[in-house]
Regions:
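Short glycine-rich substrate-engagement loop in P-loop NTPases that contacts/grips substrate
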Residues: 92-137, 180-185
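Interdomain "pre-motor" coupling segment immediately N-terminal to P-loop NTPase/helicase cores
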Residues: 1-18
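Canonical AAA+ ATPase core
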Residues: 61, 70-83, 119-129, 148-241
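Pre-Walker A (pre-P-loop) alpha-helix and adjacent loop at the N terminus of AAA/AAA+ ATPase modules
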Residues: 17-57
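Short loop/turn elements that form and flank the Walker-type P-loop nucleotide-binding site
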Residues: 53-56, 86-89, 130, 135-140, ...
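Residue-level signature of catalytic and energy-coupling elements of molecular machines
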Residues: 35, 42, 95, 169, ...
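Walker A/P-loop
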Residues: 47-94
Length: 241
């Protein structure tokens, strides 16, 4: 359950531009219970994102009900709540399968950009300029849920759709200029233009259950002669056993 933030937004506004990961962490944990370690990583990534540095993309791994989507929603709540963060409010949460055309086995980044564009227009209001729309989109935070469902291998066989998704998503996360058509006001009337959306300043938060990952790690570190120094006992207790 996500709880409303109770700290005054003005507290953050006063230090905007140099807001520390510690302050961000305290704000995020007001809406997420029992996930402090994940929130610390998220706080550092958001801090870099706000300062315009290369964002630290995040992969959230955990079974259903552990709070992955809650963390994504709470990141969006942080941007929506704090005055002064308007330029970073283009946050979109989508399912991984929406990024692939299964019929054509084709990666569809335009679907992601469309969701970001819709959010950016809400933020900027009626008839935004092309420059403002492009800049807001390039500062977006993209949350992709259930990335594990698009595995490259299913039942021991290659999954072309999963391969296409992973390659396409990794390309965007590493930084890519992608052509995208935008309708924007040029001072006289609305025009449609093709612009290049630069993903280098976007922050990506991906989440998935990754069922079977624990067994793979356990088998690796407990295998005789594996060369791994992690103790088997430590792996056993990691799952509460």
């Amino acid at each position: 359950m996500i709880e409303a933030m109770t700290k005054s937004p003005e507290t953050l506004t006063e230090v905007h531009g140099a807001i520390s990961p510690k302050v961000l962490f305290e704000e995020l944990r007001r809406g997420v219970l029992g996930q402090d370690r994940a929130l610390r990583f998220a706080s550092v990534a958001i801090h870099k994102h706000l300062l315009g540095k290369v964002s630290g993309n995040i992969l959230l791994i955990g079974s259903s009900g552990t709070g992955k989507t809650t963390i994504m929603n709470n990141i969006q709540r942080l941007y929506d709540t704090v005055p002064g963060f308007e330029n970073f409010r283009a946050v979109t949460i989508l399912n991984a399968n929406l990024l692939v055309d299964s019929d054509r086995t084709e990666f569809r980044p335009d679907r992601m950009f469309s969701a970001i564009e819709q959010r950016a227009r809400v933020i900027l209001g009626e008839r935004p300029s092309l420059a403002a729309l492009k800049e807001t989109m390039e500062r977006a935070t993209v949350c992709v849920d259930e990335v594990d469902k698009m595995s490259t291998v299913i039942a021991g066989k290659p999954n072309p759709i999963g391969v296409v998704l992973q390659q396409g998503l990794l390309t965007l996360m590493e930084g890519e200029r992608v052509p995208y058509r935008l309708h924007a006001f040029d001072g006289e009337k609305d025009r449609e233009q093709t612009v290049e959306i630069d993903t280098r300043k976007m922050m990506f938060v991906c989440g998935g259950a990754f069922e079977g990952l624990y067994d793979q790690v356990y088998n690796r570190v407990s295998r005789s002669g594996s060369g791994e120094r992690i103790k088997t006992e430590a792996v056993k207790t990691a799952d509460g056993g």
